[in-house]
Amino acid sequence: MNIRTRMKYILLILFSLMGFLITSASADCVNCNFDEKNLANITFKDQNLSYASFKGAYLVNADFTGANLQGSVFDGAYANGAIFVGAQLDNSSFKSVELELANFTNASMRNVIFEGAYLVHARLTKKQVLESNFCDNLVEDAMKFIGWC
């Protein structure tokens, strides 16, 4: 086996280990940097990820149920189908994020920024829209929320 093949196996093992640690560890990850990472289908359930950065991350179907995401930054992320049920998202930023089919049921969303976000079929309540800065931001599918702002 040549060195290039060995390196591929080592990287595969390391990335698998990283996924295992993220999905099974319950340690806090305050101020963590996940920028540009592929975190599709990863479970962050009930974890403290406050002030974490997910800029440009691939978060399709990621599960943030009950997570503390206060002050986190998701700018430019691709998070279609992401689950934020019961998450604490106060003071977070979702600038230019793809959030099609994202579920924000029972999430706390005070002062959340959605500038340029794409929210087709996302689950948001009127209360969440009014608590966030949604009405102050240019949102791609704002027609869905006419009459709420």
Stretches with model-predicted labels:
Residues 12-20:
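Bacterial N-terminal signal peptides
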Residues 23-149:
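Tandem repeat scaffolds
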Residues 1-7:
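N-terminal secretory signal peptides that target proteins for export/translocation
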